[in-house]
Amino acid sequence: MNPQIRNPMERMYRDTFYDNFENEPILYGRSYTWLCYEVKIKRGRSNLLWDTGVFRGPVLPKRQSNHRQEVYFRFENHAEMCFLSWFCGNRLPANRRFQITWFVSWNPCLPCVVKVTKFLAEHPNVTLTISAARLYYYRDRDWRWVLLRLHKAGARVKIMDYEDFAYCWENFVCNEGQPFMPWYKFDDNYASLHRTLKEILRNPMEAMYPHIFYFHFKNLLKACGRNESWLCFTMEVTKHHSAVFRKRGVFRNQVDPETHCHAERCFLSWFCDDILSPNTNYEVTWYTSWSPCPECAGEVAEFLARHSNVNLTIFTARLCYFWDTDYQEGLCSLSQEGASVKIMGYKDFVSCWKNFVYSDDEPFKPWKGLQTNFRLLKRRLREILQ
């Protein structure tokens, strides 16, 4: 690979930033992706800055009559691929946890997403947040699927807001001491793209990848670095005590600076908008990586109080801040409104693995301490609810 492409730049010129990061939803003539990255190493509760830089690459492979241009436009020279090649080439230790943030002018293409998905699966010690200035061909079904695949792979996908642009301007642009100046319709463009991405990601996923399940559903008593919640659900429409319709899926936190939408809220929003009918009875089961926070527990309890036709059972892998009285009261409020709250045991993990994980027919492999932690968490939950 060309070393001039593989090695990052420190900054870009002001005109380059304004021209390539303009957040107009439909924009022509920008055939390059610019990627500003920030890599941090997690150490305890602190994130230590490790490196920053800028990559540039073509949006899509193109045929060029000039051989040198043809080489440059190859897929491996996309900005995302340049970053992965550079990052993996540093031979970083597997026992370190890395937090990567990309600020990109365009969201990644499908071939890049395939590589990013594989990279995340092979590096469970890495988390990736992608803040995009624009969405590439977002009206096309295949490109919407690209965003869903990133989301499903565990990457956090969001639209760049004012704070993101100002941060990029300060850290990745030769700004000569000048402040970032938003352009005409900046806020309107952000709102439009934000709504579009939220709509794309609002529907449940079919399943998750094995490395995500093993990382996020491991029933540790102290689970550092699990900063988001995953929720697997089954929903049955019942008539005369028999199921006549079934649906299942997976939700995860949406990275939303306005609402910080937890997985429970994602489910309620989807369920109320697309499914709920007052004359139908529902049996809903959740398998969650974390028990609900006080705010989500309160919303779910209020929902159950208003909808007596919904019966909810919650199996949780871990108890979130179980020593905190607000979290304890949240669990109690769920129980008081009729929700059955339980700790996930071995059979529940196996059931999740079979129904919500792309397992390729591989069996579930229990981790050391699963049964011991289950008993401890079960006893703790019983003490909270009694």
Curated annotation (Swiss-Prot):
Domain CMP/dCMP-type deaminase intervals: 29-145, 187-334
Needed cofactors: Zn(2+)
Phenotype when changing residue 303 to K: Resistant to HIV-1 Vif and abolishes Vif binding
Entry EC no(s): 3.5.4.38
Effect caused by changing residue 277 to D: Resistant to HIV-1 Vif and reduces Vif binding
Result when mutating residue 271 to A: Resistant to HIV-1 Vif and abolishes Vif binding
Catalytic site: 264 (proton donor)
Record-level GO BP terms: clearance of foreign intracellular DNA; cytidine to uridine editing; defense response to virus; DNA cytosine deamination; innate immune response; negative regulation of single stranded viral RNA replication via double stranded DNA intermediate
A GO molecular-function descriptor: zinc ion binding
SUPFAM superfamilies xref list: Cytidine deaminase-like
Compartments, record wording: Cytoplasm; Cytoplasm, P-body
Keywords: Antiviral defense, Cytoplasm, Hydrolase, Immunity, Innate immunity, Metal-binding, Repeat, Zinc
Catalysed reaction equations from the record: a 2'-deoxycytidine in single-stranded DNA + H2O + H(+) = a 2'-deoxyuridine in single-stranded DNA + NH4(+)
Assigned protein family: Belongs to the cytidine and deoxycytidylate deaminase family.
Role this protein plays: DNA deaminase (cytidine deaminase) which acts as an inhibitor of retrovirus replication and retrotransposon mobility via deaminase-dependent and -independent mechanisms. Exhibits antiviral activity against HIV-1. After the penetration of retroviral nucleocapsids into target cells of infection and the initiation of reverse transcription, it can induce the conversion of cytosine to uracil in the minus-sense single-strand viral DNA, leading to G-to-A hypermutations in the subsequent plus-strand viral DNA. (Microbial infection) Enhances hepatitis B virus/HBV replication by excluding restriction factors APOBEC3F and APOBEC3G from HBV capsids.
Domain comment as written in the entry: The CMP/dCMP deaminase domain 1 mediates RNA binding, RNA-dependent oligomerization and virion incorporation whereas the CMP/dCMP deaminase domain 2 confers deoxycytidine deaminase activity and substrate sequence specificity.
Protein name: DNA dC->dU-editing enzyme APOBEC-3D
